[in-house]
């Protein structure tokens, strides 16, 4: 049986919020079977818990934000991408502020934290959402689609008319049956244009942003001294974001996601459209791991 997974141990980290610039204390904790991923604002009294579900997404400007009443948790997508990539079904994410720390702008530090905590299998079957037929949403020239696929695949295309992007790969397709999330996707950093960052700061956004946690591009070059981590790091980060956004379904996917210039808003619209169309998907489990189209790394001992 493919079993649900949680963390073996509690692990903590400190960082800053990309948009708020605030110092944030992050604690990842094991959670019981069928809990899902739950964000907890421990700076509030009483503590407010917000499950990582598509219906709890309230804002999608610059990042994916979970909302419950007037309480929010910003920038959940990179941590959720790491949870999805490592097959974590159940965990509590405690935060001392309203934003998940940006770390280095990728999912890499979160992968390291989760692997350091160790993975614990639980005595319950892991539930997958299998796409049964195509579902799509469009907005202008942007498009996001789910199609049936016996595995998990994410294809994405960006289209930036900018000197840094011309001649560089703007399309990528990752089939996770043959490609490692950790090696090929998790280290791709978020990116931004210097002109946009200056404007965002004037609006009290991106206050924590720097070349330490993002790829920063000016009119004709990448400003980061070390350059890019992957030749196609820009589009790979969009794949990383999409994986995090898709994990708001609450389960791992069996199917393919295709995005063309899609972002957090359209990704969430696609999830809501899928959820509402009960004939387009089904929940499945696997009694025999050998018959499953998706496999996960074996739980390693805690470091």
Curated annotation (Swiss-Prot):
<keyword id="KW-0441">Lipid A biosynthesis</keyword>
<comment type="pathway">
    <text>Glycolipid biosynthesis; lipid IV(A) biosynthesis; lipid IV(A) from (3R)-3-hydroxytetradecanoyl-[acyl-carrier-protein] and UDP-N-acetyl-alpha-D-glucosamine: step 2/6.</text>
</comment>
<protein>
    <recommendedName>
        <fullName>UDP-3-O-acyl-N-acetylglucosamine deacetylase</fullName>
        <ecNumber>3.5.1.108</ecNumber>
    </recommendedName>
</protein>
<dbReference type="InterPro" id="IPR020568">
    <property type="entry name" value="Ribosomal_Su5_D2-typ_SF"/>
</dbReference>
<dbReference type="GO" id="GO:0009245">
    <property type="term" value="P:lipid A biosynthetic process"/>
</dbReference>
<feature type="binding site">
    <location>
        <position position="241"/>
    </location>
    <ligand>
        <name>Zn(2+)</name>
    </ligand>
</feature>
<keyword id="KW-0479">Metal-binding</keyword>
<dbReference type="InterPro" id="IPR004463">
    <property type="entry name" value="UDP-acyl_GlcNac_deAcase"/>
</dbReference>
<dbReference type="GO" id="GO:0046872">
    <property type="term" value="F:metal ion binding"/>
</dbReference>
<keyword id="KW-0444">Lipid biosynthesis</keyword>
<feature type="active site" description="Proton donor">
    <location>
        <position position="264"/>
    </location>
</feature>
<comment type="similarity">
    <text>Belongs to the LpxC family.</text>
</comment>
<keyword id="KW-0862">Zinc</keyword>
<keyword id="KW-0443">Lipid metabolism</keyword>
<dbReference type="GO" id="GO:0016020">
    <property type="term" value="C:membrane"/>
</dbReference>
<dbReference type="GO" id="GO:0103117">
    <property type="term" value="F:UDP-3-O-acyl-N-acetylglucosamine deacetylase activity"/>
</dbReference>
<dbReference type="Pfam" id="PF03331">
    <property type="entry name" value="LpxC"/>
</dbReference>
<feature type="binding site">
    <location>
        <position position="78"/>
    </location>
    <ligand>
        <name>Zn(2+)</name>
    </ligand>
</feature>
<dbReference type="InterPro" id="IPR015870">
    <property type="entry name" value="UDP-acyl_N-AcGlcN_deAcase_N"/>
</dbReference>
<dbReference type="InterPro" id="IPR011334">
    <property type="entry name" value="UDP-acyl_GlcNac_deAcase_C"/>
</dbReference>
<feature type="binding site">
    <location>
        <position position="237"/>
    </location>
    <ligand>
        <name>Zn(2+)</name>
    </ligand>
</feature>
<keyword id="KW-0378">Hydrolase</keyword>
<comment type="function">
    <text>Catalyzes the hydrolysis of UDP-3-O-myristoyl-N-acetylglucosamine to form UDP-3-O-myristoylglucosamine and acetate, the committed step in lipid A biosynthesis.</text>
</comment>
């Amino acid at each position: 049986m493919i079993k649900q997974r949680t963390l073996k141990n509690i692990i903590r980290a400190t960082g800053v919020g990309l948009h708020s610039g605030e110092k944030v204390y992050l604690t990842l904790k094991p959670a019981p079977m069928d809990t899902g991923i739950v964000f907890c604002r421990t700076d509030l009294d009483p503590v407010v818990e917000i499950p990582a579900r598509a219906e709890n997404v309230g804002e999608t400007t610059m990042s994916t934000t979970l909302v419950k009443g007037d309480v929010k948790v910003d920038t959940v997508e990179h941590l959720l991408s790491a949870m999805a990539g490592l097959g974590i079904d159940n965990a509590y994410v405690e935060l001392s502020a309203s934003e998940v720390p940006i770390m280095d702008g990728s999912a890499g530090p979160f992968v390291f934290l989760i692997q350091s905590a160790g993975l614990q299998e639980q005595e319950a079957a892991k539930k997958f959402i299998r796409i049964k037929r195509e579902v799509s949403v469009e907005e202008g020239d942007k498009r996001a689609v789910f199609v049936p696929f016996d595995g998990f695949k994410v294809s994405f295309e960006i289209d930036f008319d900018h000197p840094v992007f011309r001649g560089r790969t703007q399309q990528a397709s990752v089939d996770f049956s043959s490609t490692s999330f950790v090696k090929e996707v998790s280290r791709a950093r978020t990116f931004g244009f210097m002109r946009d960052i200056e404007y965002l700061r004037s609006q009290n956004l991106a206050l924590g942003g720097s070349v330490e946690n993002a790829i920063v591009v000016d009119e004709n070059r990448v400003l980061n001294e070390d350059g890019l981590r992957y030749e196609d790091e820009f589009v790979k980060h969009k794949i990383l974001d999409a994986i995090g956004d898709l994990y708001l379904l609450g389960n791992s996917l069996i199917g393919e996601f295709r995005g063309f210039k899609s972002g957090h808003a359209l990704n969430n619209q696609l999830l809501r459209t899928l959820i509402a169309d009960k004939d387009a998907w089904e929940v499945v489990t696997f009694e025999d791991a050998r018959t499953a189209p998706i496999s996960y790394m074996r739980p390693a001992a805690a470091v």
